[in-house]
């Protein structure tokens, strides 16, 4: 099964997550099919806390990819931000 989930990166005590499409059986930080964007929970100043390709995420969900709870929240958040920008 294909999932959309967060892959952890960054340093100790400074998490940074890539939003990726991957097989459910692969390790959390292992190989992935496509990187859709990133989430930086400790962003400060001019740093963007979330960048996500909403169109690609919708396309993967239409193909049957299952987002995790947190990934689904971030997708909704990115959609709202995109609509507000228009």
Swiss-Prot record:
One of its GO terms (molecular function) is structural constituent of ribosome. InterPro entries: Ribosomal_bS16, Ribosomal_bS16_CS, Ribosomal_bS16_dom_sf. The keyword Iron-sulfur does not apply. Keywords: Ribonucleoprotein, Ribosomal protein. It comes from the Bacteria. GO terms for cellular component: cytoplasm; small ribosomal subunit. Pfam families: Ribosomal_S16. One of its GO terms (biological process) is translation. NCBIfam families: S16 (TIGR00002). HAMAP family: Ribosomal_bS16. Belongs to the bacterial ribosomal protein bS16 family. This is Small ribosomal subunit protein bS16. It comes from Halorhodospira halophila (strain DSM 244 / SL1). The gene is rpsP.
């Amino acid at each position: 099964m294909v999932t959309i989930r967060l892959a952890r990166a960054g340093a100790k005590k400074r998490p940074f997550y890539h939003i990726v499409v991957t097989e459910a059986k692969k390790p959390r930080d292992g190989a992935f099919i496509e990187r859709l964007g990133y989430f930086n929970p400790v962003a400060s100043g001019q740093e963007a806390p979330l960048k996500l390709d909403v169109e690609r995420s919708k396309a993967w969900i239409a193909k049957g990819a299952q987002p995790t709870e947190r990934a689904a929240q971030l997708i909704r958040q990115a959609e709202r931000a995109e609509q507000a920008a228009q």
